[in-house]
Amino acid sequence: MNADTTQEPVATRAAWQDDAGRDLVRSFGDRMALFVRGEGAYVWDGDDKKYLDFLAGIAVNALGHAHPVFVEAITAQAATLAHVSNYFATPPQLAMAARLKRLAGTGESGRVYFGNSGAEANEAALKLARLHGRGTDRTRILTLKGGFHGRTMGALALTGKPALQADFLPMVPGVEHIDATVEALEAAMDERVAALMVEPIQGEAGVVELPEGYLAAAREITARHGALLIVDEVQTGAGRTGAWFGFQHAGIVPDAITVAKGIGGGFPIGALVTFGAASELFFPGTHGSTFGGNALGTAVGGAVLAEIESAGLVANAALRETQLREGIAALGSPLIGGVRGKGLLLGIALTSPVAKAVVAAAQEHGLIVNAANDDTIRIAPPLTIGDAEVAEFLRLFGAALATVSDALILEGAPA
């Protein structure tokens, strides 16, 4: 390799892996590929191999890669005004806030706080809960076991995964993780609870939906006890589940939601959206962000949301869910145990703990998917996919399953 390490890594597998191992923080482990460009639902690696991307940056690239609307929004706004700080307002910021309020159904009383990620949005939600309890005994915050709300310290405390917290103790105090049952919520709830925070679908737990009726019950219970109901829509928002936001499937009105990922279509942006009286909890000086709500990010986010709406991509997510469920079942693989999730956030349950092997086989066949856990494959493709991409996914995924099944048979294990 060139001795000048400031040069761009060359696109050979060994070279880029050496560069990544030397220059990038190790918290992500080994990178699985070096991608150099994308278009639509496809990406290409440094050797010009083409892949069907059914992960979309983990539910981020709602419009796929290099969508003209995304590119035009970045180009036009970068040439106009990128950032001025939150001492000032900009037209894209105001427009995106109004759009989020309308899509979430907050009414006039809703407000929007912009950050740069889902973790930042959830940190803002944690502060919202603290402000709700300010000056009272409401110091308890409830979240669900198995939930994931981010890796910054406040968001990590909200996350119901002890293994992720173990190296960073002590956690922010006052957060308790409970089972995702109405009975557990009733038992835990009292007048000292400031908020309950839940995900409509726990993506990082293996695409696990809340029990039927849970959100409606949670809304009634929290309201009865004067606690906030905060819904983490970072992975489920922006049309991914076949509704604009996951809570809308339950027909409830929360006190706040957090959003990120798909609302930027690949540009880093997050937001806390508040409803009703919760909108009055923040006051000047209680929270802030240098880059949150910058003109460039909100121009892109506003354009992405507008395209999702005008192109009918929320309905498309629901349509493609039906096709994918039927197609996955029709594969007839003994490795498939079922499908969980909604819209285009689906978890394919496996009958053996071979998810990582399936992911590797899929990549060899030119398909990008994700192992949510040892026995679940997560798919979260662009909302723009059509019949052709669904058919190609089923072909490639079927081939990957066959590869793993054959390997299991050779090893003498049940396939």
Region locations from a protein language model:
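Conserved N-terminal phosphate-binding loop of PLP-dependent enzymes in the Aspartate aminotransferase
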Residues: 2-415
